[in-house]
Amino acid sequence: MLFSSINFIYYFLPALLLCYYISPKQFKNYILLIFSLVFYSWGEPIYVFLMIFSAAFNYSMGNEILTYQQSQKNPKPTLIFTVIVNIFILSFFKYYGFATDIVNTVFRTDFHTTPLPLPIGISFYTFQALSYIFDIYNHKVTKHNRFIEFILYLSLFPQLIAGPIVQYKDVENQLRYRTVDMQDFGYGAERFIIGLSKKVLLANTLGSFHNMVIKMPESSQSTAAVWIGIICFTFQIYFDFSGYSDMAIGLGRMFGFHFKENFNYPYISKSVTEFWRRWHISLGSWFREYLYIPMGGNRVSPLRHIFNLLVVWSLTGLWHGANYNFILWGLYFGILLILEKYFLFRILDKISNKIRVCLTFVTVVISWVFFSSETATEAFSYLGKMFFFKGIPFANADAHYIFASSILIIMISAVCSTPLVSQAFEMLKSKKAIFANFILLILMILSTASLIYTSYNPFLYFRF
């Protein structure tokens, strides 16, 4: 079940809100847990048991590590065992087929595999479970917790499918003691509507234009057309994912949870380094805290620092999917970050901020070619068309049509990807709140109409 669906908005969510707010305080976590499991089971009736196993296993291992620490015993073997089991489960479902393909290629074997459906949200809830284990080991979580609190932490439906990746220490108190006032609920509803409209009105529209370019006969894919297509995808993935994060943050606030922001206008970044401080913040924080810093971070020799960055970014790419494209995508950013650290910043510091923003944006646009393509061959072919290496025309009639059809939504998206719209809306709220609420109502009506009358409603991060 997606947040951007009629079933969720007009059936599931009202039923949950009613049950949650009429139930006594001591039952609220149980209500949330039941509905979260139903939410997950809607699309994964079998794999819900895998998530429950993950919760039970990591909860028991966390308690064992705590017990060892309190009795002055060495908990490291338990930590290593727990990490191995989590990584094995994630790898089995996510990378089994990819690993078999690599073995077949390297050793010229012919092993056949039956494709396994990927459990929804497994990358997210596995990373949350690991952060809980690491935080216990590092004495950042120091008390035994009730199982209901831990399984709710892993399965809580707002952030279950697509994040943000929540650390236990950030919501530990909220799982036990939380309150919701009208201001919290109103803010949550506002964030949900804004996220829904970003997803449905912007991302879905942009995605239809990107699909139009992808499905063109190759002879019709001019340089201008493929640039328009990947620019549409660039804004699509931002509004798709940030819109879902907005909805998750808003839903969490309706039930008293304060999740951290996951995006901070990444397309206004003046460098790739800054971009990754603004894009998918919770994932970047996870890798930095639990992998990059333990490896030594930047407090090591330049060669070791470069090695650390390449490892972290290879794994960041691999986290997104079992495909060479994602590894290349991660390495692309890793190499750019290394170049910025040791060379490019000296040049960038001499360039105006506006030019830096444009250069960074183009750099990020190029990266999405790897992300949006099915294979590495397809990605490099697309890049060849972008940079005139394929002997195709710069523009043709199809390119003119797509440009004329998409230019308005691209311009709207460009403005909405900056703080300008948010600042204007906040100013309107402070002076004429009724008009701001009217805008939210219109956005909700338009989003609902779009969901009813159009069938194109993908979610790009759903597969991770």
Show which residues each predicted segment covers.
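Membrane-embedded transmembrane alpha-helical bundles that form the catalytic cores
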Residues: 1-417, 423-463
